[in-house]
């Protein structure tokens, strides 16, 4: 059977009914569950297996039976490890039914079907005597996320110890330690606050209003692959310090709320703007088997790992890769100026049942620091990458150069299209006679209204719909301007909604009106990822266990529910270029409704496995052949085949992952079909050996 789903098309801006199989949501959940990423984490798998072998052997030597409970078994991999290590009984639970059904088949295929009791429930719903015959004395689980406690580990462990485990039960992992490092980073700070927008001479055009300056921001973590943050982009103000321990093994309840006040000394002067955060886990009771999520500069095994990889590997790329446990940035509500090395200050560290937050102060706080929230609309409306993009100086300079060269004081009448377009507001500060700002989003509009009021801009009018514009307003326009950026956009070309809006008013615009950007080009680049491709790559076997049934399930679901191109922040995921970029679509916004059907081939100029195709948009501001008239969402430096690509850090690019990448390929064949009226933009890729 099929059903119809209400889907927003980002290019047309219209909701439409889309026919989908009635199991579409199931396939979407399976394809995006993230189990494959964990199974490609060889360090995690090896160390969990080693901890199980060591712990079970130790319990045996002590004359104890071993009854294992595996919470959130997924594929059943940890349960099979426990069986292999000699457990007397293994009970596994998995509440996600598609995964539980797959685990049942995997267990049978690996000869463990009759050795593992599989319960299709959450662990908090299990009853001893009804679901499992006895309490377990060994708990193995992977309940952690980047924040450590964000998936509810505290509550799950507390319930397990109270209801499902014996008094002397051991746990794998046994305990976790959380770390913080205070740092200054003008680059990372751009993801959190709004800077003054200045003209090309450095004179301020738009100042952030007081409510933005005083806003403490959102306490939510900003999860990133911290090792990929350039070392030149931050100044560590302290060494890493341990802030919390979580003992998963103790019978006593783990506290749901704690606070820790640390007195630290700065290593060098700077502004305490943010906290880098990560954790490690001791998988065995003795603490000998350690898995660290530290960035490379703080990793306890950096020297050994670097020696294994060799000198041709940058240090940032030598650590075992994982995307399910990363590092995080927490932004300090009010940055603290540390004027000299050795300056003492206080770091307040807090956690509740699911999250953490931090503050830095010169004087010790007299009461508990509450979790802060956004009060200015900026943080609650825009993503971290969009906030950074608004602040991106090199990008802004190209737009401002266009505006300064084209806006005539008291003569220009400008229509601005897009969400949160501060650069459009800058045309008012540059002296435009009038600025019509299309801003239908309530919170984004409220933010821009506060900026208009604070900067005393008198000639700005807000619009909900471009269709509401009077003929007299449209005929007076001299410029239509956009970045473009729209809140519904996920992939870079979703911002082609700019063309859709233009089409609605095109016939009523004067012939002399200047439209910027005038065109957009999509580029494709065949690449070899070091690791990112693993999120879609089949697992095959893991620690000697056959997981091909899992691969088949995920592949079936991915074919049903996963787009051929997905959005990723590629600066976090190193890749080498295998060729130069090639244009695969050119859209002129003056003739936006024209359909395109294109084909081509890219010759690979560097040996390697093409396990990804990166795609992005270049926006052409004016019709001139100058790099200064292009704003790119792709590489920030020229692409050289065989070298790592340096990507724009404030936007996500599109990525296509070939289903079965192979070596020896000489050409990447591509086709593009674009039907703008329908909002359909489809790519296909094939690998060929000539």
UniProtKB/Swiss-Prot annotation:
Pfam families: PrmA (PF06325), PRMT_C (PF22528). GO terms for biological process: peptidyl-arginine methylation. GO terms for molecular function: histone methyltransferase activity; protein-arginine omega-N symmetric methyltransferase activity. The keyword Acyltransferase does not apply. Residues 14-357, 366-690 form the SAM-dependent MTase PRMT-type domain. Keywords: Methyltransferase, Repeat, S-adenosyl-L-methionine, Transferase. Belongs to the class I-like SAM-binding methyltransferase superfamily. Protein arginine N-methyltransferase family. PRMT7 subfamily. Essential arginine methyltransferase that can both catalyze the formation of omega-N monomethylarginine (MMA) and symmetrical dimethylarginine (sDMA). Specifically mediates the symmetrical dimethylation of arginine residues in the small nuclear ribonucleoproteins SmD1 and SmD3. PANTHER family: PROTEIN ARGININE N-METHYLTRANSFERASE, PROTEIN ARGININE N-METHYLTRANSFERASE 7. This is Protein arginine N-methyltransferase 7. It comes from Drosophila yakuba (Fruit fly). The lineage of its organism: Eukaryota, Metazoa, Ecdysozoa, Arthropoda, Hexapoda. The gene is Art7.
């Amino acid at each position: 059977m099929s059903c119809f789903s209400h889907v927003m098309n980002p290019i047309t801006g219209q909701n439409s009914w889309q026919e989908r199989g009635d199991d579409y949501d199931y396939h979407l959940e399976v394809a995006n569950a993230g189990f494959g990423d964990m199974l490609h984490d060889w360090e995690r798998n090896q160390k969990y297996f080693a901890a199980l072998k060591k712990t079970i052997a130790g319990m045996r030597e002590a004359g104890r039976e071993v009854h294992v409970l595996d919470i959130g078994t997924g594929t059943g991999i940890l349960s099979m490890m426990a069986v292999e290590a000699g457990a007397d009984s293994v009970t596994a639970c998995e509440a996600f039914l598609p995964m539980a059904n797959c685990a049942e088949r995997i267990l049978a295929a690996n000869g463990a079907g009759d050795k593992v009791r599989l319960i299709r429930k959450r662990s908090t719903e299990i009853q001893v005597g009804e679901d499992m015959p006895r309490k377990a004395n060994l708990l193995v689980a992977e309940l952690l996320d980047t924040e450590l406690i964000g998936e509810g580990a505290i509550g799950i462990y507390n319930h397990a110890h109270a209801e499902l485990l014996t008094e002397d039960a051991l746990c794998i992992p046994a305990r976790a330690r959380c770390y913080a490092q205070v740092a200054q980073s003008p680059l990372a700070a751009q993801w959190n606050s709004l800077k003054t927008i200045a003209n090309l001479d450095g004179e301020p055009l738009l100042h952030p209003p007081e409510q933005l300056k005083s806003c403490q921001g959102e306490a939510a973590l900003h999860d990133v692959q911290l090792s990929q943050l350039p070392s030149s982009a931050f100044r560590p103000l302290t060494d890493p310090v341990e802030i919390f321990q979580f003992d998963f093994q103790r019978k006593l309840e783990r506290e749901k709320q704690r606070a820790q006040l640390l007195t630290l000394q700065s290593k060098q002067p700077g502004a305490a703007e943010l906290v880098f955060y990560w954790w490690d886990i001791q998988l065995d009771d003795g603490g000998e088997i350690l898995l660290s999520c530290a960035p490379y500069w703080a990793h306890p095994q950096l020297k050994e790992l670097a020696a294994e990889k060799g000198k041709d590997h940058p240090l940032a790329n030598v650590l075992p890769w994982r995307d399910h446990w990363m590092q995080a940035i927490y932004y300090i509500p009010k940055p603290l100026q540390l004027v000299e090395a050795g300056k003492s200050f206080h770091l307040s560290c807090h956690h509740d049942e699911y999250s953490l937050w931090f503050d830095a102060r010169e004087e010790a706080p007299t009461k508990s620091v509450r979790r802060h929230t956004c009060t200015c609309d900026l943080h609650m409306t825009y993503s971290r990458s969009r906030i950074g993009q608004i602040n991106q100086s090199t990008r802004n300079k190209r737009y401002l150069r266009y505006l300064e060269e084209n806006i005539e004081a008291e003569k220009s009448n400008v229509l601005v299209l897009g969400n949160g377009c501060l650069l459009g507001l800058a045309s008012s500060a540059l002296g435009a006679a009038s600025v019509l700002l299309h801003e239908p989003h309530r919170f984004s509009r409220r933010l821009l209204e506060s900026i208009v009021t604070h900067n005393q801009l008198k000639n700005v009018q807000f619009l909900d719909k471009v269709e509401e514009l009077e003929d007299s307003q449209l005929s007076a326009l001299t410029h239509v301007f956009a970045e473009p950026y729209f809140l519904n956009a996920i992939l870079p070309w979703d911002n082609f909604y700019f063309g859709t809006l233009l089409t609605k008013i095109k016939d009523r615009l004067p012939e002399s009106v200047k439209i910027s950007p005038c065109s957009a080009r999509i580029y494709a680049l065949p690449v070899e990822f070091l690791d990112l491709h693993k999120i879609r790559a089949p697992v095959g076997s893991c620690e000697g266990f056959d997981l091909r049934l899992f691969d088949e399930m995920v592949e079936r679901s991915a074919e049903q529910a996963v787009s051929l191109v997905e959005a990723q922040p590629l600066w976090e995921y190193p890749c080498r270029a295998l060729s130069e970029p090639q244009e695969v679509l050119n859209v002129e916004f003056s003739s936006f409704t024209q359909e395109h059907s294109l084909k081509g081939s890219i010759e690979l100029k560097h040996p390697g496995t093409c396990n990804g195709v990166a795609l992005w948009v270049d926006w052409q501001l004016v019709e001139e052949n100058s790099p200064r008239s292009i704003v790119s969402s792709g590489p920030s430096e020229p692409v050289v085949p065989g070298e790592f690509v340096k990507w724009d850090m404030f936007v996500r690019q599109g990525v296509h992952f070939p289903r079965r990448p192979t070596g020896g390929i000489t050409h990447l064949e591509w086709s593009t079909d674009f039907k703008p009226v329908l909002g359909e933009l489809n790519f296909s890729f094939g690998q060929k050996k000539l």
